Amino acid sequence: MAENWQKVNTDPVCFGARDDTYGALSITKTGRVKTMKLVHRSGSIHCNPNDVDSYWSCTHSGVGNKLMTIITNTNKDALLPPTGDLETNPGNGKKYFYSLKGTGHKSPELVFRTLSNPLSLSRNQELQIWYGQDWVDVSEGNNSGQVCVDVFAWYI
């Protein structure tokens, strides 16, 4: 079966690591989407000045291979990954971690899992791409950097 990825951004979408610097994305096509993926274009993010670069997460030893890049609606409700996939950080009780088999903090693509209930998206609908700590306003004071991505949706 042929892959059915369609690019849904015109210019790269950039998001930061602190101070509500989400990346805003205006959807280019109405339809039902079974998943989305982000393709790294440029930049990196740090959750600590002493840790190495990451595209999707934090390389601090306490995080391991967990990911922290989240797509939300304008109400900041998690769409991808779905809220039920998010894990709680035991240090602060906030949910913003998740795992995707085969995807690490410097993978060139972040492909979210296929949804059992596809998303219904409308042309010109705004979605937001967040760095997890910034999304839940926790431990972001020493975060830095910005990542720019292309966004693809799998329409059904």
Listing of model-derived features with the role each one plays in the protein:
Residues 1-156:
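Acidic, Ser/Thr/Pro
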